[in-house]
């Protein structure tokens, strides 16, 4: 639209629309970038408050949405995770949310080209050292996780899921 938004609306997989105030947004020669602060909800952890940046480049001659991990986003180094070894540790649900949001905006703007999106997390590489990531096979930064688009409080099920993941990798 050419205007810097006061809020950014995100549609979660559960259909809930969440509005957040960006830290900043800017246009570039080839697209735009925007940063938000990670909300930890009821599950405050070492990632709460970190700036998450989405940089989008318009690709008029390339269809679809390509998603990359930038600074502060880890790389998958072991099999058994959501993404293949070598890929950015951005799970399939956040990837789908990003793609769907861009596809909606493209339709609203009558844009028929593609997008290249780079997700970065300020302080992600340093913060990741204080997480499970190095143990489960994510190196160099944080994982972009999620199943519902809403932070759920830490639960026994989350702990069991982590243990199951480690067992799957050991098998």
Q: Which positions does each model-derived feature cover?
A:
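Generic N-terminal targeting/processing segments that precede catalytic cores or assembly contacts
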Residues: 1-136
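Glycine-rich anion/phosphate-binding loop at the beta-strand->alpha-helix junction
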Residues: 122, 127-129, 133-171
């Amino acid at each position: 639209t050419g205007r810097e938004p006061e809020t950014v609306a995100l549609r979660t997989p559960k259909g809930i629309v969440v509005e957040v105030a960006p830290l900043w947004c800017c246009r570039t020669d080839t697209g735009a970038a925007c940063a938000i602060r990670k909300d930890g909800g009821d599950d405050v952890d070492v990632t709460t408050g970190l700036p998450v940046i989405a940089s989008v480049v318009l690709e008029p001659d390339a269809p679809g949405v390509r998603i990359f991990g930038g600074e502060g986003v880890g790389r998958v180094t072991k099999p058994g995770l959501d993404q293949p070894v070598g890929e950015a540790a951005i799970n399939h649900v956040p990837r789908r949310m990003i793609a769907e949001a861009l596809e909606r905006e493209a339709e609203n703007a009558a844009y028929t080209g593609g997008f290249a999106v780079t997700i970065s997390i300020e302080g992600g590489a340093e913060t990741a050292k204080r997480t499970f990531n190095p143990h489960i096979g994510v190196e160099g930064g944080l994982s972009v996780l999620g199943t519902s688009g809403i932070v759920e409080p830490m639960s026994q099920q989350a702990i069991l899921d982590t243990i199951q993941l480690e067992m799957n990798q050991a098998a």
